[in-house]
Amino acid sequence: MLTWQDPKTGLEWQCESPGEMTWNDALEYAKSLSLDGKNDWRLPPAAELETLLDRSILYDKLRPTMRQEVPFRDTLSYWSSTTFAPDTYSAWIVMFDGAYVLSYYKSNSYHVRCVRG
C-alpha cells in the first residue's frame, strides 16, 4: 500500500516515510513526489498532521495516540509545512510519541509524510 485515504478528512496520505531530512529538503521532496500516478503531494500543515491523532484515547501522561485505523502508526516526529511565526528559521513538527507539537530549527532532520487533497 503506497497511500491511504483518511475516511474522516478525505486527505490521502503517503504510507511510507522516505526518512529524515531538513525542512527545505522535505518541501522539495514533496514537490517532486509522484505516487499512484498523482503528483500533487505536499508537506502537510501541523493541523493536518494532528488529524491523525485520536484524542479520545490517552496514554502515558494523558497524551493522545495515533488513530487505530491509520495503517502507518508509529511514534516518530514529522515535519509540517507550518513555519513558526516568531522565528522563521523554525517550523512546527508533530511528535507522535506523546502527540507533542513543537517548533524546531529547519536545519534539523525529521521524518516526512506527504499528503494530498
Task: Give residue ranges: language-model regions.
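Short, structured beta-strand segments at or near domain termini in extracellular proteins/domains
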Residues: S77, S103-G117
